[in-house]
């Protein structure tokens, strides 16, 4: 986070209007960049690069990234670079119903067959506009001609306006969870060295893992093992300092 802060501060002092944290490969890195950049007071956009299966190098999907980063104050979230245009359509469509911020798409002007012509690029970008992308552009291989054709596609496409949504959602890096009235907390789980195994066992008796935070070591274990959970995670603690540390460091969105 400190390294990102140095970069963000330098750009802010140079007079930029917004900050873009792009080609992120995991949610931990993206959170750190956003937390550092937002201290400038400037709008911050965060975009990830994904493979042909719609996941980052760490296995993250766009949906949990959107849920996490929009709750931390990102101005927009989305994708750039990646495996071309077609790889982005499904992740964007999946994220759209739960996005309270604009979605971004800046793909490479190429696919598995090679470079895309400006005309072909503009035609394929229609998929991403249809999927809900509001802020669009290009990454590797794009030229002024590609952007000119994209401009025309945008002008002829109805604008998708982000709407207020009821975000009863939490997330770990690889999964999003949507909370309803049927919450069943497990018995409080200590965040000790056996946390990974305890999280597996909790899946058999509840739909929310309730973790007890009592000391700094508990927070450290949460950060190390919490991302393995296949359940949404809720925290219970009487220590505000520990809670703040856990919320600041956890890769995802928690129930408190």
Model-derived features: positions:
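Domain-level signal for soluble alpha/beta catalytic cores
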Residues: 1-256
